[in-house]
């Protein structure tokens, strides 16, 4: 920087709303883990089913993701990465399929899928402190899982923080 240039001082004062923001606490408004929706089981049903979220047919890859997620037992979680490894795919592709899941909460419990670092994230595109994460945490708590204040898995129904991967 030359001598003729000066550094700009911050114009924000301590009274600026950016300095005094209060953290919003989200309360779950959807903790349903019991509703069972129709799931196509035959080839013909799968071929003709229209996803109400997209108004398009569900892809073969999405059905592969959903079939695998359906195997995750209540009180357990797996990761997007573990699913993608099993499917020989990518975690983002798995997340995209779950974001469009029209069969939740059951028979396809996408709320049982968490990030590789064992934190809740990606649920309906939500990360961090948001309504979607609060809802997912409430669903998992109803199934016996515990998370810390940063939404990281502390224990599953077995009392440990293991990830389900027994496909």
Short names for language-model regions:
Residues 2-21:
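Short Lys/Arg-rich cationic patches that frequently serve as NLS/NoLS or arginine-rich RNA/DNA-binding motifs
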Residues 17-167:
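Nucleic acid-binding interface residues in structured DNA/RNA-binding domains
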């Amino acid at each position: 920087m030359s001598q003729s240039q000066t550094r700009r001082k911050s114009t924000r004062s301590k009274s600026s709303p950016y300095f005094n923001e209060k953290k919003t606490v989200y309360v779950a408004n959807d903790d349903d883990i019991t509703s069972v929706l129709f799931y196509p089981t035959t080839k013909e049903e799968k071929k003709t089913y229209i996803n109400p979220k997209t108004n398009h047919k569900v892809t073969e890859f999405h059905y592969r993701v959903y079939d695998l997620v359906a195997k995750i037992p209540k009180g357990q979680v797996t990761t997007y990465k573990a699913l993608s490894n099993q499917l020989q795919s990518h975690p983002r592709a798995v997340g995209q399929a779950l974001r469009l899941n029209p069969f939740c909460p059951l028979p396809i419990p996408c709320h049982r899928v968490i990030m590789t670092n064992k934190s809740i994230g990606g649920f309906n595109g939500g990360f961090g402190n948001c309504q979607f994460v609060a809802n997912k945490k409430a669903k998992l708590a109803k199934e016996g899982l515990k998370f810390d204040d940063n939404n990281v898995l502390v224990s599953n129904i077995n009392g440990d923080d293991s990830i389900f991967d027994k496909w």
